[in-house]
Amino acid sequence: MSRVAKNPVKLPSGVEVKLVGQQLSVKGAKGTLELIIHSSVEIVEEAGELRFAARNGDQQTRAMAGTTRALVNNMVQGVSQGFERKLQLVGVGYKAQAKGTVLNLALGFSHPVDYELPNGITAETPSQTDILIRGIDKQLVGQVAAEIRDFRRPEPYKGKGVRYADEVVRRKEAKKK
């Protein structure tokens, strides 16, 4: 059984939470995020904390309470600190350049790849082979990073491709005669 929902979510200073019906709104220094809460989950705000409880004790409801707690915790962290994901380009001639809401990638194809960034996401290129994806929505930051990585995944023989900065690519040995 998950015990995630038993831990309260602490609200840092500057973060405001508003619950209207089943709509939860979290507002902070970096922006506002909204979430529709499942009807089987009950949320109580007390003393700068949010507490989560299942309305009845069955397994699915308890699981939903834990999931809701994790999502709200990510929202609170996002509007106060934000999230970032770092990508690296490994390969000869692989380059990235951020131009406003478009990320221009040269990944060894016969054409450049232009990736349109969704609202709420910013991309920085500190160097030609590093990409920093930033935003307040953890799911969206991870989704954008995964979509960029999917253009050219790291291959196991030379390790060329787009990889997460903390990713370890398993290498294979070349075929021997």
Swiss-Prot record:
Biological function: This protein binds to the 23S rRNA, and is important in its secondary structure. It is located near the subunit interface in the base of the L7/L12 stalk, and near the tRNA binding site of the peptidyltransferase center.
Gene that this sequence comes from: rplF
Keywords: Ribonucleoprotein, Ribosomal protein, RNA-binding, rRNA-binding
SUPFAM superfamilies: Ribosomal protein L6
Family from the record: Belongs to the universal ribosomal protein uL6 family.
InterPro entries found in the cross-reference section: Ribosomal_uL6-like, Ribosomal_uL6-like_a/b-dom_sf, Ribosomal_uL6_a/b-dom, Ribosomal_uL6_bac-type, Ribosomal_uL6_CS
Domain of life: Bacteria
GO BP annotations, alphabetical order: cytoplasmic translation
GO CC term (a single one): cytosolic large ribosomal subunit
Any Pfam family the entry gives: Ribosomal_L6
Keyword rRNA-binding: yes
Protein name: Large ribosomal subunit protein uL6
NCBIfam families: L6_bact
Molecular-function annotations in GO: rRNA binding; structural constituent of ribosome
Subunit structure: Part of the 50S ribosomal subunit.
